[in-house]
A protein has these predicted regions:
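Exposed loop/turn and edge beta-strand positions of beta-sandwich/beta-sheet ligand-binding modules
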Residues: 29, 74, 278, 293, ...
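Residue-level signal for mature regions of secreted extracellular proteins and peptides
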Residues: 32, 36-39, 268, 286, ...
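Secreted/processed peptides and extracellular or luminal domains of membrane proteins
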Residues: 45, 49-52, 281, 299, ...
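The −1 position to Zn-ligating cysteines in a subset of zinc-ribbon hairpins
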Residues: 38, 42, 271-274, 287, ...
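Conserved alpha-helical substructure of the radical SAM core
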Residues: 2-132, 343, 364
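Radical SAM enzyme [4Fe-4S]-AdoMet core and its adjacent flexible, acidic
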Residues: 1-4, 128-291, 295-301, 305, ...
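Short, intrinsically disordered, charge-biased short linear motifs at domain edges
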Residues: 24-34, 257-264, 311-321
Length: 364
């Protein structure tokens, strides 16, 4: 048995044990950090729109204090705002790689600021311990639709320029991976069908196209989620288009399980997979608010209390019980992924059902 396989199995066993219960003083191994609130676009599906472009973002020193308080973090998901607008982006990443042992960083971006993004990434990739940095380019459809939806006539063109830059940078450092992310809504099903083919054919460095289902308090309240039958067919199309690049990709085994879980969650209107938000994952917003997930309100603020004063508070314990009792549900991949992967029963269930769906799809 190879050393890398033993390491992965050991990690999986450790995190599966962690998923059972929260103990005081335990750092969530999967942390979502809104690195800023500043954004240059006006996306209609944004769930964070009420909090954008504020003047109370955490300072570098406040991020440093947070990092020094926290323990080991497996994966850091940085969000915003547009994350690469943050001047100290690379320095903040460095805090978490050095102080918290972060090995993987995922960042969604609108791709508008090519030069800034390259500068920040070159800084981040100076880390000798970082194993993977995934840059996720957000695209809503083909150019005309995407530009109109995001309120900027050059947003698609700028994103493609950033993809080209990332492809060049990846040749220098293969730890950099390039994904695209699209929010599925009732109105952009045809757009995504065409977009996924376009990205596969024109962007050979992109290894994965992810579909997320619209959620939360979107800016345009009229936007609705897709009909599930259409969404299932769209996902089958995306999977077929990208199957040549999914083979061997880190995370490719989990992808069909995520899609299965999202559909079952919507179909049943319940927390179909027992959620481990507040145990395996947590959220820190740009203003210092701390929450267990993006569905529930914040539990406290880092400018008034330390992270663990908030994370281990009576209010936090009560919310963990609510989540455990399945009083909420969502289709957020960032929380579904660890909830599936590090619960053996759920992992087996998702693996079997996702495989059955793949067999059914291949037979139609």
């Amino acid at each position: 048995m190879s050393t890398s396989l033993v390491s992965r199995l050991t990690r999986h066993a450790r995190l599966s044990a962690r998923a059972v219960n929260h103990h005081e003083g335990q750092t969530p191994p999967f942390l979502i950090v809104f690195i800023n609130s500043i954004c240059n676009l006006t996306c209609e599906h944004c769930f964070y729109w009420r909090n954008l472009n504020q003047r109370d973002d955490l300072t570098y020193d406040e991020f440093k204090r947070l990092s020094l308080e926290l323990g080991q973090i497996e994966i850091l998901n940085l969000s915003g705002g547009e994350p690469f607008i943050r001047p100290e982006f690379a320095e903040i990443c460095q805090l978490f790689t050095e102080n918290n042992g972060v090995k993987q960083i995922y960042v969604p971006t609108n791709g508008y600021f090519t030069d800034r993004t390259e500068k920040q990434l070159r800084g981040v990739l100076q880390s000798k311990t970082l194993q993977r940095f995934v840059c996720e380019i957000s695209l809503d459809g083909m150019p005309a639709y995407h530009n109109r939806f995001r309120g900027n006539p050059k947003s698609f063109e700028k994103a493609m320029e950033t993809v080209d830059m990332l492809a060049r940078l990846q040749k220098e450092d293969p730890r950099l991976r390039i994904h695209s992310n699209t929010v599925a809504m009732s109105e952009n099903m045809d757009e995504i069908w065409e977009l996924t083919e376009y990205l596969h054919d024109h962007c050979p460095a992109i290894e994965h196209h992810n579909l997320a289902i619209i959620r939360g308090d979107r800016k345009n309240a009229s936007l609705q989620g897709p009909a599930l039958d259409r969404y299932k067919k769209l996902y089958e199309h995306v999977a077929e288009v990208w199957k040549d690049r999914e083979e061997g990709r880190f995370g490719s085994v989990v992808e069909p399980m995520l899609q299965w879980a999202k559909v079952k969650t919507i179909e049943t209107g319940t927390q179909y997979v027992p959620c481990k938000a507040g145990i395996l994952s947590g959220v820190v917003y740009a203003n210092g608010d701390v929450s267990m997930c993006e569905t529930h309100p914040p539990l406290g603020n880092l400018r008034r209390k330390s992270f663990f004063e908030i994370w281990d508070s009576p209010e936090a314990k009560a919310l963990r019980q609510q989540i455990k009792q399945k009083q909420c549900f969502c289709t957020n991949e960032v929380f579904l992924w660890p909830s599936i992967t590090f619960q053996p029963v759920q992992l087996t269930k998702a693996l079997v059902n996702a495989k059955l769906l793949q067999i059914q799809a291949s037979g139609t």
